[in-house]
């Protein structure tokens, strides 16, 4: 029998994280979100993160879906809800994801009521800093903005309002155009 998954420490935060990522995917053609999916990074590491966001293979993404349905290669962003495993998620997994080219890694430390966001820079993970308004803004996914204070407080209406602000930026619009251009280029070659 599997270990119990607690509602407050995992179930609700996981649902909120998926809601945020799913809303981004809904208005960003060429982007895919996964929930508890096995990812084959290398011969020694097949994690099953809580969530991931990737650029679809057809739109230039760095991961593929194998014939067995497992994701091969690193998605651009991985997210984890961590209660008791925060130390493992911030050390061992962090290094595995870095070595394999995951561009961004989010860890929601539920018990500490904190979100930590890392981005890959020169083959090293560095913490992404919040802007002056206290928001995280993804570098891999333009327009993916996170109000982490409201996320940990369970204020999803505010989280989605901030995300919507990111989705109305010219950076997001240009990203959608770039994704479509990449898909068109790949379609012409096939």
Locate each region found by the language model:
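Gly/Pro/Ser/Thr-rich low-complexity, intrinsically disordered segments predominantly at protein N-termini
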Residues: 1-190
């Amino acid at each position: 029998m599997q270990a119990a998954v607690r509602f407050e420490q995992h179930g609700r935060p996981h649902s909120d994280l998926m809601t945020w990522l799913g809303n981004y995917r809904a208005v960003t053609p060429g982007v895919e979100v996964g929930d508890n999916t096995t990812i084959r990074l290398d011969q020694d590491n097949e994690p099953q993160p809580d969530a991931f966001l990737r650029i679809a293979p057809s739109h230039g993404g760095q991961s593929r879906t194998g014939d067995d349905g497992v994701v091969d290669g690193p998605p651009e962003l991985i997210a984890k809800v961590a209660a008791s495993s925060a130390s493992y998620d911030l050390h061992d997994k962090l290094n595995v994801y870095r070595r394999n080219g995951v561009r961004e890694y989010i860890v929601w430390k539920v018990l500490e009521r904190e979100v930590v966001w890392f981005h890959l820079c020169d083959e090293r993970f560095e913490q992404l800093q919040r802007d002056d308004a206290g928001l995280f803004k993804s570098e891999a996914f333009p327009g993916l903005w996170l109000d982490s204070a409201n996320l940990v407080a369970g204020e999803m209406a505010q989280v989605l309002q901030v995300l919507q602000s990111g989705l109305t930026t010219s950076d997001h619009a240009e990203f959608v155009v770039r994704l479509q251009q990449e898909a068109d280029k790949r379609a012409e070659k096939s």
